Structures are given as C-alpha cells and as structure tokens.
C-alpha cells in the first residue's frame, strides 16, 4: 500500500487506497490528534482568538465547534443535542464524527480532504491555498499529525 513513509522520513499524507471500511481508524486517529492527554470526551479547547469561530471553544474528544452540534446531532444521532449533552455522550461524539468524516470522504473522494475539512472547513487544496491554520498549526502539519496516528493504527490493525 502507499502508506509508507518516504525516504526523507516525512509522513506520507496521500492515501489513494483509503477505503470507507477504514473510517473508524481515521476517526480514532483524529481523536488522538485532537485530544490526546487533553481530557478526552469532556475536553474543552482554548477560546478561539480569530476567524469565524472567534470567542468559541471547541468541545469533546474531536474538538467540535459548538455551532455545529445542533445540526450534526440532529442529522447523525436523530435528536438535537445541547453542547453539554454532547459532552456527556461519548457515543454521540463518535457517531457524529464518523458520519461527518464519511460524508466528506464520499463528497471529495479523498480522506485527506475529509481531514482537512474537519480542521479548516475546506478541502486540502483550498485550505493550503488559503494558508488555513488554527492559530498555532497549519493544515500540512495537522494532516501530518493525523497521518502519523493513522499509520500507527493501521499497522496495529493488521
């Protein structure tokens, strides 16, 4: 498969062979990037300093922006949840994130785009062009962190 590191030691971030059956591993890798050591399912991120989410704090194991919770829980869990209900429900967090990732993977055809959309709201090429970042890291670094986690999980899963 193409998930090997290249000679420069850089993490491979291109997954042409990614299959929808690996979406759970993709989700687990995302959880590791977003909240490892940071409080897991009840985590609250730092206050966003700029951009469309200014003043807000991402929540949960996957750092979901609160404004997305009502519509995403309605769509994927079957009932609208408040931020607090969402924080108290690890299963709802897993369901929402897995379905959002799958939806964006199906929409764009590449897992890298689905991960980029998660981080920036945009597919990879657009995010790179816009120099999208969360104030501390940009999308290439985020994708690289995700890839490292994903590759490790894929190895363990064999």
Which functions belong to the PLM regions below?
Residues 1-55, 67-95, 99-158:
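Non-catalytic cell-wall polysaccharide-engagement segments
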Residues 61:
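Acceptor-substrate binding/catalytic loop of class I
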Residues 64:
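N-terminal carbohydrate-binding/catalytic regions of secreted carbohydrate-active enzymes
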